[in-house]
């Protein structure tokens, strides 16, 4: 249930801040959002998969923490990221 290498590379390419950036909050949030979207499709057909649901909740909470951190550090970067990902924050 993970993303393939091409998808990850595309996300990193789109949200990175400099050519060697792979760990900025923007990249991490974008990767987590892609994994969350992937899992939401899985739950449409596997409603009783509680083990994966726990992992989903951990990812959602990790994304929330990263977004809170980004909001406290740089409000403009936070707004740009939320609008580009289409999150409800």
Swiss-Prot record:
GO MF annotation, one: rRNA binding
A Pfam entry, by short name: Ribosomal_S15
Biased composition (Basic and acidic residues): 11-20
Keywords in alphabetical order: Ribonucleoprotein, Ribosomal protein, RNA-binding, rRNA-binding
Signal keyword on record: no
Annotated spans, Disordered: 1-24
InterPro entries (alphabetical): Ribosomal_uS15, Ribosomal_uS15_bac-type, uS15_NS1_RNA-bd_sf
BP-aspect Gene Ontology terms: translation
Domain of life: Bacteria
One GO location term (cellular component): cytosolic small ribosomal subunit
Self-association and partners: Part of the 30S ribosomal subunit. Forms a bridge to the 50S subunit in the 70S ribosome, contacting the 23S rRNA.
Family of this protein: Belongs to the universal ribosomal protein uS15 family.
Function: One of the primary rRNA binding proteins, it binds directly to 16S rRNA where it helps nucleate assembly of the platform of the 30S subunit by binding and bridging several RNA helices of the 16S rRNA.
Name used for this protein in its record: Small ribosomal subunit protein uS15
Organism, scientific name: Thioalkalivibrio sulfidiphilus (strain HL-EbGR7)
């Amino acid at each position: 249930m993970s993303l393939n290498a091409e998808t990850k590379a595309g996300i990193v390419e789109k949200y990175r801040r400099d050519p060697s950036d792979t760990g900025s909050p923007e990249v991490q949030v974008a990767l987590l959002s892609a994994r969350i979207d992937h899992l939401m499709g899985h739950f449409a057909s596997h409603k009783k998969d509680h083990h994966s649901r726990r992992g989903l909740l951990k990812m959602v909470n990790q994304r929330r923490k990263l977004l809170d951190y980004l909001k406290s550090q740089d409000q403009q970067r936070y707004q740009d990221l939320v609008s580009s990902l289409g999150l409800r924050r």
